[in-house]
Amino acid sequence: MWILVSWLALVARLVAGTQCPDGQFCPVACCLDQGGANYSCCNPLLDTWPIITSRRLDGSCQIRDHCPDGYSCLLTVSGTSSCCPFSEGVSCDDGQHCCPRGFHCSADGKSCSQISDSLLGAVQCPGSQFECPDSATCCIMIDGSWGCCPMPQASCCEDRVHCCPHGASCDLVHTRCISPTGTHPLLKKFPAQRTNRAVASFSVVCPDAKTQCPDDSTCCELPTGKYGCCPMPNAICCSDHLHCCPQDTVCDLIQSKCISKDYTTDLMTKLPGYPVNEVKCDLEVSCPDGYTCCRLNTGAWGCCPFTKAVCCEDHIHCCPAGFQCHTETGTCELGVLQVPWMKKVTASLSLPDPQILKNDVPCDDFSSCPSNNTCCRLSSGDWGCCPMPEAVCCLDHQHCCPQGFKCMDEGYCQKGDRMVAGLEKMPVRQTTLLQHGDIGCDQHTSCPVGQTCCPSLKGSWACCQLPHAVCCEDRQHCCPAGYTCNVKARTCEKDAGSVQPSMDLTFGSKVGNVECGAGHFCHDNQSCCKDSQGGWACCPYVKGVCCRDGRHCCPIGFHCSAKGTKCLRKKTPRWDILLRDPAPRPLL
């Protein structure tokens, strides 16, 4: 039975807090422990939740056997492991205390509150994905998620941050709750707990907008160029693209350790990312799950990081649902509440890219590996793909190692004193001629394969003669992918690097609009090039530059690299050579 201390003092000093007889300070009230010897912080407004004092973590450990009997070995938020004086403990967010299993740590980590199944989950929030403790009220938070007001049948304030007791109204101007009995300070909501029936939340969207990671994790690039998940927030991604370290540490790849001033821990291996559940903007473009499609000032789609967001008229920013865009202050407003508005990010293609095989790594004339892979022979004699560029193919014909490593026995890779696990090769895909089809701008218009739909001055669509191009804001010009439009200088600019991949040639057909010779033709918006066999092939650029290897070509204004796999910029490209077709072609 919990004995409440100084209830009258609690009511009078709800905001100021309460000092317990033993000298400790509690934000709401003090409760005498069951033994009657010690005090703990409690909150009578949340009914009478059992609260006990937490214990300090003591001693480092790797496994439970390193701790005394009755202790557990816990991973802390700092990435270290320490012994907890509970047989089944839970690490607190302060990294210094722990609580028994079945208890939740307080914000300062000094007390533990028991939230058993009989208490937690009594209040189900709409959708049955989140729940609040008994005698609490579900309220929407500012980010659209569910929060809990620590009072039964509470009034949720329209700022989505605060709440008031039942029967009271929110006075956000004076930050008070108004009731017939007087005024009270506004109460602040806390996040709702995900129910046991709810699926794990994946709120961390990676920069490629195609991969997502679980809550409290960090996106890190893998050797394949894709993204994986480091299982802790704000982690440090190591340069080997295989490991990661806790925040405020340094990757020591030679010793395979994470180093900080206070401690050393082992490197962590990244986990694969998860595909994003996409929100379709149109037939070709999509945004990550939980985002909203909004038009950018270029006419292209952008993604706002809110569900059911409000797209601002400047075509750059967006606001949470229910808010209004205030362009003068650069804020989102809801009543007296103001929050900074968010900037949209470019949406990504959601349908298979017609150029998907263009960047493949060719193994021979019939087989290829994805971009940033290496062709390696399998034990069958066929080609396999190692999921990293310029990799070392191991003699067992099963594994491969990163560049600079040596293949060791049992599938390991070694570089100096460092050992990592080898990667298994994947099957190649057979190279086939792409089906030629137009790129749809909308339901009524399209552009040829290898070009990009851009909005025109007339409000309709026009075609840029480059794939995945950047549409300039003047709606008359476009630039290659990776460049920005400089409207005043009338140039396409790139801060660093002036390289783009070259394009593979396709076989010339017997019919077409551009005559090559010897009865061979290429389609409109293509160029004729001699292939490696001396015949004719088609380059998907207008006035394209044919590479010496007879397999690739580059846009006008570029020249081919020595191997023909890259296009090097001669000088800053002027956009007067990148004019688009006056009108797109209708879909058939």
Swiss-Prot record:
Residues 1-17 form the signal peptide. It is found in: Secreted; Lysosome. Ubiquitous; most abundant in the spleen and several tissues of endocrine significance. Cleaved by ELANE; proteolysis is blocked by SLPI and is concentration- and time-dependent and induces CXCL8/IL-8 production; granulin-3 and granulin-4 are resistant to ELANE. Cleaved by CTSL in lysosome thus regulating the maturation and turnover of progranulin within the lysosome. Disulfide bonds join C125-C138, C132-C148, C281-C293, C287-C303, C294-C311, C304-C318, C312-C325, C319-C332, C363-C375, C369-C385, C394-C407, C401-C413. The keyword Signal applies. GO terms for molecular function: cytokine activity; protein-folding chaperone binding. Gene3D superfamilies: Granulin (2.10.25.160). InterPro entries: Granulin, Granulin_fam, Granulin_sf. This is Progranulin. It comes from Rattus norvegicus.
